[in-house]
Amino acid sequence: MTPSRTPSPWMLPVICTAAFLVIAQAFMMAPLIPRLAQVFHTNVGWVGLAVPAYLLPYGIATLVWGPLSDRFGRKPVIFGSLVLFIALTAATASATSVAALVAWRFATGIGASGVVPISLTLIGDVVPFQKRGRALGWLFGSIAGGTAAGATVGALVEPLVGWQGLFLAVSAFTAILGVAAVLMRAVPSLPRSAAPPLAAVVRGYASLLSLARGRRTYAYVAINAVVQSGVYTWLALYLRQRFGLGEVGIGLALLGYGIPGLLFGPTIGRLADRHGRSWIIPAGVALTGVCALLLAAPLPLVAVQAAIVALSLGYDLTQPLLAGIVTDLPGNRGQATAVMAFLLFTGFGLGSLLFQLALTWGFVTALILFGAGALVAAGVAVSMFRDERPHQTVPMLTPAA
């Protein structure tokens, strides 16, 4: 797909800010779990379901938004999803029970799921692969920053404005961003693809999964998401139980997550563009595993905070680079990105659920299980991604025998 005009210099700042707000709102729930359990007079297990209730439908709905963006264009889908996100985020503040909260989170997950993945597809449309790493570094740095800011702001600001005020504020800020994006014409209008029949859409997904390069990349998108989300979602409860921290202490402890992505995301992307992804991806998965194991150890709070920062860096070394590979797969880019977003966000949701199940044996056991699994995956990744050299994609495009 070729752009009809040169993209606005505001395109990347706008879509990165939108991604920041969408993800901040998603992970704003994590530190609020203990507080909302008190508000709704229930246990943390029930309130904790609000996290996967958002992430799982988010991931599933991306399979629909991708083909829709191919048919109707990236710009209408991004703005349409943004409007749904604004409305449903505001509506979440009306919840008076945990059941209503979970229901609103479910609906918001569906509505919001067109913003980030279609923005990623848009980058793939207008930025050549040789320069895509830096742009994706900014986007995923914004996602990591949103994860950190959501958790931190949720913990620090909730005592001041209430949990309802948090959702209303995110909705208002996103509405302002949407109006500014329209006025600045930040999102380019690209030529629409011919609308494929349903059978062609199904064949497109099957074709992507027939590629060895596609299968291994998608597998590590899912693995990375499960480990990162599983550990991160429950850090607020971990910090409360282990160190007795309140909302402010939890917010400050989580503040470091996302900082590496904001500071080093574009630099990591440039390294990938220049030197390839063959060693960076396994290193990121390994770092994630090491951080999970460190959190299981009896470390002081300052060391735990350092491990949380390093956990974020593990994400920054993996997901943006995996996304770069996905946007280079042959075939329909909207569908390729939709599969990645589906696995990424369903992985986030499943990671939260699986870690919650592992918590029946305690935090130490759960962290060891997740950390050991990540280290095994890192070892396998060394051989799986050995051919991801800079700008050499042709040998990887043939289906596996």
Where are these regions (language model features)?
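Juxtamembrane intracellular "pre-TM" segments in multi-pass secondary transporters
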Residues: T2-R5, A186-Y218
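Conserved MFS/SLC helix-loop-helix module at the cytosolic interface between two early adjacent transmembrane helices
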Residues: I60-T96
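Helix-to-loop junctions at the C-terminal end of transmembrane segments
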Residues: T62-G73, F264-G276, L359
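Cytoplasmic helix-loop-helix junction between adjacent transmembrane helices
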Residues: W104-G145
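Helix-loop-helix hairpin linking two adjacent transmembrane segments in secondary transporters
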Residues: W138-R185
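C-terminal transmembrane helical hairpin of 12-TM major facilitator-type secondary transporters
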Residues: S278-L322
